[in-house]
Every structure is written in C-alpha cells, then in structure tokens.
Amino acid sequence: MVKESDILVIGGGHAGIEASLIAAKMGARVHLITMLIDTIGLASCNPAIGGLGKGHLTKEVDVLGGAMGIITDNSGLQYRVLNASKGPAVRGTRAQIDMDTYRIFARNLVLNTPNLSVSQEMTESLIIENDEMVGVTTNINNTYKAKKVIITTGTFLKGVVHIGEHQNQNGRFGENASNSLALNLRELGFRVERLKTGTCPRVAGNSIDFEGLEEHFGDTNPPYFSYKTKDFNPTQLSCFITYTNPITHQIIRDNFHRAPLFSGQIEGIGPRYCPSIEDKINRFSEKERHQLFLEPQTIHKSEYYINGLSTSLPLDVQEKVIHSIKGLENALITRYGYAIEYDFIQPTELTHTLETKKIKGLYLAGQINGTTGYEEAAAQGLMAGINAVLALKNQDPFILKRNEAYIGVLIDDLVTKGTNEPYRMFTSRAEYRLLLREDNTLFRLGEHAYRLGLMEEDFYKGLKKDQQEIQDNLKRLKECVLTPSKEVLKRLNELDENPINDKVDGVSLLARDSFNLEKMRSFFSFLTPLNERVLEQIKIECKYNIYIEKQHENIAKMDSMLKVSIPKGFVFKGIPGLSLEAVEKLEKFRPKSLFEASEISGITPANLDVLHLYIHLRKNS
C-alpha cells in the first residue's frame, strides 16, 4: 500500500514527539511511524525532566511551541530549582515525573493532534531519488511517500542490550532493534559509529526500608516549565538519599572481569557525565561512597529508580550490590540495570537545520546525532520539525545562534565539532550563559515564536509591552543619579540598607543583593506599578549589568568579525594556532569570508580569532 504525506517522522520518542507535533501545528500533513504506539513518550531511563542546562532546553522548547514543558507540568511528582543559591544564569528547573502519566499524556497529545496520523510498524529503508528523499518502506510492505523525512530512532539502530555476559539485539530492553534501517544508513555512506548508554535498576517501593534515609523534598513554591501553565499546585512526593559503601565497592571490584564494560564486550563509548557504577568504582577508587537517589517512578510509589547506580553487571551481582546498600537490604528488584550499544551518525554530516548534507529532505534528531538526554532530543526534534516545514514552504531556515539559545549552542556544537561520546548539555557549554537564563526565555525567543506562528498574538503583545517596560525603566534607572543627601540616606536606612558615600545611579543601587523586589518598589515609586516578571528582569539586569554589557560587546565584535572577507588565494598553511585539521578543511572548502569559515565543521571560534588576526596582519603588510 502506498500512502502520502508532507513529512514522515520515524520514531515516537522525545525527539519524534516534538518533530511531529510542531510540524502538524505549522500546517504540514505529518505521519509518525513507530514500532509501538503504547511506548510513545516513554522515559526509558531516569524519571525526570530538566536540570542544569536541560531545564533551559525544556523552557526554550516550550516557548517555541513544543510539548515537553506542558507534559511535564501535568505529570510531575516533585519540582525543584537546582543551584537556587547561585546566580540566575546557572539555575535549572528539574522535575521528577510520573512515567506512566507522562507517557499517556504524550501519546494522547500525539493521537489527538490535527494533521498528524500514526501507524505501528517498523521503517526498513529509505527511498531516495537523485539524492533527494522520496519516502520509506516498512516491515509490513507499506510505502510512505514524503519530501521530508525526520529520523528520530533513539537507541534502536542496531541496538544491543548487555547484562553481564548476555547480549540481546534490542533497541530497549524487550523491544526489537532496528537493524534493516541501520544497515540502509551505512550503505548510503553516512559516517556511522557506536555509542553506549545505560540505565539503573528499579526496586519495589514496598521492599525499601526508608527509616534512616535522608528525605529529599520538592520546593515549597514549585517552579514549572511551561509559560502556558496556570494555577500550578502539584502533589509532590519525596525522594530519598542513600550511599554505596566499601562492601558495595568490593562486590563490584570482585566482578570487574564479568562486567561488559571491562571485558571488551562493549565497544561503544559511554556518557562521560553519567558513568556506570562499575566505571565510577574503577575511576574513583579512593572514594569510600557514592551518593544514590531513590526516585519514585509513579504517584503510586510502587517502583523506585536508583539514580546513580547505572550498571550492566550480571544479575546475581546486581542483587548483591543492591542488598549491600542501606535501606535496600531486602529490596526486590523489579527491573535490572543494563547497558545498550547503538549506532549513531556523526552530526558533522548535518547542516544547522539538522538536514543531512548528503540527502536533501532527510533530517536527523535525537540520539541518532550522538546526544544523550530527553531534553536534548526534544530540542533537536523541534528544530528539525520546524525546518522541515519551512523547507516545504520554500521559506528561510530557522537557525538559532549561540547567543540566542541553548538550542543554538547544542546544534552548533554538534554540527561543527561532532562528538565521540554521548553529548549532554551543561550551562558551562554556553559562552553567553549570562544572556541565556531560564528566567528570560520568553523574552529571548518570543519574537521567533510569534514570527513562526507558534505564539498567540494577545500573549505576544503583552510580552512586547513587558519588554518595552524593562528597557524604559532600565534607561530611567541609569539616568537616575542619587547623592548621599539626608533624604536618600534616611530612605536607605528605613529599608535597612547600607548608606551610599558617593554619587550612584539607580542601576548600581539595585545591583545590591539585599535590594529585593519589595525594596525596589518602595524606593523607586515609578517601579511600583510593574508586574513581578518585569521587576525580576530589571533586578537581574541591574545586578549583572557590567557583565551583560561585556557579553553584548563580545557578540557585536563577533558579528563584525564574521563579515570580514578572506582574500582570494589566502594561504592557511603555516598560521600558528591553526590545527592541521583546520588547515586541511579551510584549504579544501576555500571560504570567502569568516562567516563561511564558521560554517565548516571542525572550525572553532578560536580558529576564527586566529584567522581574523592574520588576515589583518597580512593586509597591513
């Protein structure tokens, strides 16, 4: 049977959900092919969304019309702001989720979205003519025609599950791997490599002894992810903290020879920042204990996920390890931990739209691009979906810059640098992180969302009004010069604030940590009518004014630099500071400007700085 649509999405994980929903929302006829409809939106690993860097991604996806934020707000079990005591740039919202509620909410959203159809089958091969996508074939002899195809297969491409010495061809425990499509992608000449990730054991909630374990609560004023969420008052459950101990470590050491990670059974590289427990014991042998979090998987507390205990050790060893841990002495394992090895395509094969350079109309998103994490997958799925629709309409692509969004950082890192290990987002990856805070996501991306038709006009008008009020009042505060007069000193004293000794402007005064929103309204009467969202932005802009201005200067400098032309016949060889790889790529592609050079995979900002300097030096000489 032959069926037609505008866009095909292959895979119903977090990337596939966002890609299919956003494309349908933008008016395309979308068909989602997934192996099991019941597993759409399944959280395969930890029962949580968000965190440091990841919370930023989730909120950016939300503002740009994505679903992850609203699904999380409707399925969370505990909400917290991580790094709450630190500056706003490095804070991150995180939620424990009810995995069943999340999956059901996501699945129903997909199944009830106009312009979006779903079928349960396995994609086996791509149909390509003249290096352009035409469609796909499936395992039940269906042919789907579409000009745009988005592959979001997660860990299913040639997936192999490892538990001790045992191996099974699975894309997830108990589910078939996608071997035909994996072979097809290799035959098409893509640079295919292997990665590894893992998951932790789960235990029955009624078999845990919680007495004596440290209880971990959610925030009293729980944060939420979606700007559309109203009247947020979730039921929150506690997590619990326990630790491994020297006995645990000895059990693991005694079984290193049976660990797939060390026996040579696993070839793929695992996530650096989420190592297995056996890897931690091996690498950090001096540590006497490692922290573990017991996280409820559902509101019923029937199962707990042991966060921090990712493992692929044999079943009998997993039993001994778990029973050596305080609170888990009599725990019943409901699901064992395992490692999974899978194919991914080097993301340097992609443009910034996530379209492959090799085949027009083919987009990749999620773990197939070498990333790890639900949030990273969702962000890529969203951007692939948006760009596939824009390409169908012959409109300009939507590419976020590194100074606009963490999504921009994520995609730029992937397509220019590639990866040899599962890529995870952190705030430290963003050089402009002071501008890319969670609290200003709406202000950063609202304009884009509205332009793309992904934000309602009334809300957008209110947002623009808020932005104007922020700018106007910051200008007024800068122009407001205060002197240490009797009246000023008296008012500061009434607010329990230290006196000023010299002239200061309003921005400098509000930069004080102690000057909260209530004091702001009290001291500057013109701030009194402003809503809390506007006041909060004014406060943050004042506090980090010097650093924010510096980052804006750096952005302007970079934008100016990228406009610099590279002289015809320019010799790249012999320039100190340029790696051999950079020289080879520059000689091969012969960019006409620094902007064109910046688009070449493997060319770093440091390379551009060096090039800029030597272009200038050679012109002057």
Swiss-Prot record:
The keyword NADP does not apply. Homodimer. Heterotetramer of two MnmE and two MnmG subunits. SUPFAM superfamilies: FAD/NAD(P)-binding domain. It is found in: Cytoplasm. Signal peptide: none annotated. GO terms for biological process: tRNA methylation; tRNA wobble uridine modification. FAD binds at residues 11-16. One of its GO terms (cellular component) is cytosol. Belongs to the MnmG family. Its main location: cytoplasm. Its cofactor is FAD. Keywords: Cytoplasm, FAD, Flavoprotein, NAD, tRNA processing. One of its GO terms (molecular function) is flavin adenine dinucleotide binding. NAD(+) binds at residues 270-284. It comes from Helicobacter pylori (strain Shi470). Pfam families: GIDA, GIDA_C_1st, SAM_GIDA_C. NAD-binding protein involved in the addition of a carboxymethylaminomethyl (cmnm) group at the wobble position (U34) of certain tRNAs, forming tRNA-cmnm(5)s(2)U34. This is tRNA uridine 5-carboxymethylaminomethyl modification enzyme MnmG.
